[in-house]
A protein has these predicted regions:
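Solenoid-repeat scaffolds in large eukaryotic assemblies
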Residues: 49, 56, 102-105
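Hydrophobic/aromatic side-chain positions at a characteristic register within alpha-helices
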Residues: 41, 94-97
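Glycine/charge-rich, flexible interdomain linkers and switch-proximal surface loops
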Residues: 74-81, 130-131
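TPR repeat positional signature
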Residues: 26, 33, 82, 87-89
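N-terminal first-folded block
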Residues: 15-49, 53
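Short, solvent-exposed, charged loop/turn and helix-capping segments
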Residues: 62-77
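Short terminal interaction segments
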Residues: 1-16, 99, 103-142
Length: 142
C-alpha cells in the first residue's frame, strides 16, 4: 500500500515539474554517467564502467523516444541522428574500453546540455512574460 502511494506521489511530482527541467536533469545525469564510465575505464573498474555506460545509453534512448518528429521538425531529426551516433560510440567504448570514445560522446553531448540549460532560462523568462515557449521545447514530448 505504501509503495503504491509513494509512486502516485512521485508521479504527481513529476507532472508538476516543467518538462524542460526533466530534459535538463536527464542531460546532467547523462554527462555524469559518461564521466563516471570514463573514469572507471581508466581505473580498470569494468563493472562500474558497464553500469555507467548502460545508464548513459538508457538516458539517450529515453531522450530519443521523447522526440516529437511532427512538432519538432528538423530539430527532432538532428537530435535523433546525434543520439544514434552517441549510442553507437558508447557501444564501441564498452567493447574497446577506449576512454577517448567516451570523451568524444561527452564533447558531443555537452553543447546540447548547455543549450537546454539556456532554453530553461529562456523558458522561465518567457513564462514570466507570457511568451510562447522556444521551438526546441516542441521537439520533445513528455
Amino acid at each position: 500500500m505504501y509503495a503504491r502511494q509513494s509512486r502516485v506521489y512521485q508521479d504527481a511530482q513529476l507532472e508538476a515539474v516543467p518538462r524542460i527541467r526533466v530534459v535538463v536533469a536527464l542531460y546532467d545525469r547523462l554527462l555524469t554517467s559518461i564521466d563516471a564510465a570514463e573514469q572507471a575505464s581508466r581505473a580498470g573498474q569494468i563493472e562500474v564502467r558497464y553500469a555507467e555506460t548502460s545508464r548513459a545509453v538508457e538516458i539517450i534512448s529515453a531522450l530519443a523516444r521523447a522526440l516529437d518528429f511532427n512538432s519538432g521538425g528538423e530539430i527532432a531529426v538532428h537530435l535523433d541522428r546525434i543520439y544514434r551516433f552517441a549510442i553507437q560510440r558508447l557501444t564501441e567504448f564498452e567493447v574497446r574500453n577506449d576512454p577517448a570514445l567516451a570523451q568524444q560522446v561527452r564533447h558531443l553531448i555537452d553543447p546540447l546540455a548547455t543549450a537546454w540549460r539556456q532554453l530553461e532560462q529562456e523558458s522561465v523568462q518567457a513564462s514570466a512574460n507570457n511568451v510562447e515557449a522556444p521551438a526546441a521545447l516542441r521537439a520533445m514530448r513528455f
